[in-house]
Amino acid sequence: MGLTKGQVNSSFWKNKKVFLTGHTGFKGAWLSLWLQSMDAIVKGYSLEPNSTPNLFTEACVGNNMESEIGDIRDLNQISKSMLDFNPDVLIHMAAQPLVRYSYKNPIETYSTNVMGTVNVLESARKCSNLKSIVSITTDKCYENTGVNTGYKEYDPMGGHDPYSSSKGCAELVISAYRRSFFSSKHSASLASARAGNVIGGGDWADDRLIPDILRAFEKSEPVVIRNPLSTRPWQHVLEPLSGYLLLAQELFLNGDEFAEGWNFGPKDEDCKPVSWILDQMVISWGNNASWSLDKNNNPHEAGFLKLDCSKASNRLKWDPKWNLQESLKMIVNWHQNYLKGVNMNKECLKEINKYIN
């Protein structure tokens, strides 16, 4: 199959069986809709959605896929679920994704992000049709030295807090499984993907910047911010998802040539401080939106994080399409449409279509 480099190819995905963990989460719901729009046969395995409202429910994501509620920490259930489906492609996104939550719940964070990954990969070993595995970690998996040149894929794993550390551990698990069990000609090809702070319509999670901003705007309250100078690699959710899909395509077609770690982050100019994000969203929202500073002492969060994505650009021909200003306007527009009662399934598919074209 001749594919154009750097393009998510809908004819490749048509009728491919894709097993997706974490499909009820924010990124998982967007990816489920994108796969459905290309006529992939999708089975999701995840906990119940973790907020009310949530994108999975509001955009009727479960209508065009098989959806199983389960915990990746349950080896028997995840193994049976995956084996019964016998996928062509596996994308592992299920995780405990929050830094501050990980301080309160370190055991749950490690058991989900480390042993959960072991369980998913262990289950994958038994699937005879499986050719391509993409396991998602985070930009926070790197040992954060505060360098501002951008972390490269070969930089050391680390993590100051339990969440970041658990994702560094997951990367070590993926690397060991790749070399031990997924390196023969007859096995699936396994890669990891590391992305930054994803943003987009339909994120209602606790303790995340954009949802916190939108909740305050809705109530006409000022947004209270703890680290206005904190810089993050912000990117629209469809940017890394396009990277995951491109990577999965290449693993399926070209095998071990692409079986390694990959960074998917925004352009340098989109690594902006929190205060800049707030100012843009205040303008887009209108209606007297505002923000103020939280003076309480807060747990440590890494002050500077940036990814070097030149490898993905050179070898996968993946590059970000939307700048941050555009993305923030789209998020405000998405949320205001939601408040007006617009059909959010159609709204998401329209956004995916706009991204592709």
Predicted regions and their residues:
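N-terminal Rossmann-like NAD(P)+-binding domain of SDR-like oxidoreductases, especially those catalyzing
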Residues: 1-195, 199, 338, 348-350, ...
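Residues in well-ordered alpha-helical elements
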Residues: 75-76, 88, 100, 107, ...
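Generic structural signal for alpha-helix termini and adjacent loop/cap motifs
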Residues: 105, 123, 127, 180, ...
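Residue-level signal for the nucleotide or nucleotide-sugar donor/cofactor binding architecture
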Residues: 8, 73, 104, 112, ...
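Conserved C-terminal active-site "lid" loop/helix of NAD(P)H-dependent oxidoreductases
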Residues: 237, 261, 297-319, 330, ...
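C-terminal "lid/loop" region of Rossmann-like NAD(P)-dependent oxidoreductases
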Residues: 259-263, 272-278, 286-304, 344-356
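NAD(P)-dependent short-chain dehydrogenase/reductase
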Residues: 145-150, 154, 162-163, 168-255, ...
